[in-house]
């Protein structure tokens, strides 16, 4: 939460400075000016942060593969995720995090209800260095596409099975080496009704090839964030349901893994 705290601190300092510089505290009721002045400085500081983030993102060449971890870009990703969740007034309630103790890298499998789902997972598991396999359009979004590229997020072409399998093999290699953990949404798309969609079990090949644990998670409430953003507090849940050990994952067919994970999420 470092960036968020700095933005709040800077905006408070600038508000105090504004009062003293312009001698605004001449009457007792002038204190009511503090909130709008602070809000103005807060928005200005936030805008400045995103401007700096944009300028930093311009240094990233998405055509070049990432060869090693980039701690600075991971820090930027984590800080920006926390900032956005704070701006959106999102509160995360978690259960089962103790099941992740001792896990260095894993495949996180969850239901998909909102574009904010990855934000919640990254904010909840910052130590995991989560990366996602995502649709190619994500990498065309200004700032976002370049930052996540540096954090080993991978685009997958679902219209080309051979290319998609190449992405899965590369993700398995990164997972096996412990470079990052990966998150996937086996439904393949967001559920607009809240009902769990059929699973595409091929993505479980990432964990099978890597011999890595699978962390099964259920999220709820994320579909409300966009509608309430900043206007109303949103409480979301992040529940770790079970962890399948890597040795078991290697032996199980992907269909059985998918059926088991889906049964827990229902």
What do the PLM-derived regions correspond to, one by one?
Residues 94, 108, 132, 238-240:
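Generic preference for hydrophobic
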Residues 7, 165-266:
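Non-catalytic C-terminal accessory region of glycerolipid acyltransferases
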Residues 94, 154-157, 246:
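Short acidic-hydrophobic, aromatic-tinged amphipathic segments that line or gate anion-handling sites
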Residues 2-105:
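Membrane-anchoring hydrophobic helices of lipid-metabolizing enzymes
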Residues 57-77, 86-87, 101-161:
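Catalytic core of membrane glycerolipid acyltransferases/transacylases, capturing the structured
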């Amino acid at each position: 939460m470092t960036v968020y705290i700095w933005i709040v601190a800077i905006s408070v300092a600038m508000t105090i400075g504004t009062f003293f510089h312009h001698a605004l505290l001449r009457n007792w009721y002038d204190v009511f000016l503090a909130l709008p002045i602070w809000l103005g400085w807060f928005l200005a500081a936030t805008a400045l942060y995103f401007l700096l983030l944009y300028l930093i993102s311009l240094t990233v060449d998405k055509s070049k593969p990432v060869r090693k971890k980039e701690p600075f870009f991971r820090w930027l990703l984590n800080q920006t995720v926390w900032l956005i969740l704070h701006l959106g007034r999102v509160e995360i309630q978690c259960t089962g995090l103790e099941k992740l103790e001792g896990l260095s890298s894993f495949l996180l499998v969850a239901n998909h209800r909102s574009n904010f789902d990855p934000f919640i997972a990254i904010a909840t598991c910052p130590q995991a260095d989560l990366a996602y396999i995502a649709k190619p359009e994500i990498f065309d979004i200004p700032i976002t596409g370049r930052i996540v590229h540096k954090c080993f997020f991978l685009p997958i072409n679902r219209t080309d099975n051979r290319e998609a399998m190449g992405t899965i093999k590369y993700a398995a290699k990164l997972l096996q080496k412990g470079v990052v953990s990966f998150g996937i949404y086996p439904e393949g798309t967001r559920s607009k009704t809240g009902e769990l969609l059929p699973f595409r079990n091929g993505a479980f090949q990432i964990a099978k090839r890597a011999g890595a644990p699978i962390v099964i998670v259920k999220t709820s409430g994320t579909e409300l964030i966009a509608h309430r953003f900043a206007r109303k507090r949103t409480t979301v849940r992040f529940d770790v349901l079970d962890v399948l050990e890597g040795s078991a994952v290697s032996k199980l067919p992907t269909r059985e893994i998918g059926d088991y994970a889906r049964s827990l999420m229902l």
